[in-house]
Amino acid sequence: MPQDRSSPPNPRLPLPVQPTQLPLWHERVRGLPNPIARSSLFTVGNQNEPRSFYREHRTIQTLAGWVLTVRGEELRQDDEDVFLQLIHLARCQPLGEAVSFTAYSFLKELGWKRSVEGYNRLKASFDRLQFTSIRLSSDTTSGDGFYLYQGALVRKFMGKSADSDEPKSKWTVWLEPEIIKLFGPSAYTQVWWEQRLRLRSALAKYLHSYFSTHEAPYPLKVETLKGLTGSRAARLTDFRKALRVALQQLVAEGFLDAWTIDGADIVHVTRSTRGKAAKVLPAG
């Protein structure tokens, strides 16, 4: 039998140190993993329509290079707002430690109503983030059972009921420490928070996150964008109409300089200098 001639690990060599804390980006931006921003995990579904529910892991649309499956209740752009703010608060301490805040302050940061309706909406979003499970892998390792991340976006949530007489009581959330894998040096994007909050259209918010992941966005077919956004528009014509309105909103906000949809139904956009400012903000 041939002998194993490989060298055993040297116990004196230090093991690679794994980061335990998220990057300390600037207060005016929010961090979002690129594979999530370039997928239909957070859809543009209408808040007046029932959310889909997937009992088994279902592969959702992403750009080439990644495979993302989801099980649980459909996540939408309001859930992305909550996730962005939660991750922002969590960056100040090691992952896995409790993240505490008042529901009042959280709602205020989101621009949501500080009312029973707002508290219930926030709690429902945390519930979805806790009970919806994702699996993310590269398209070269998806068949090997290796996942860059596997689990819920929120490990645990504790908060008082919306009708509590203590509106400024503490709510507490725990994140999975493994979520750090989604925030490597070139694996996440800084989203300009004030711009995002001013956008009232779910489609405009999605496009804002998506195009933030590219300094010079690649042209993309309207049909591809429809799939990535998770739009339920019955006809591509209807989606294209909404897309034009959303793109113009991004121009009005100073995020885009220009956009066109050419004769081949391909979307071309030009990021503005102001839109790229979030990329160069120092931490603090």
Where are these regions (language model features)?
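Charged, alpha-helix-forming regions
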Residues: 1-284
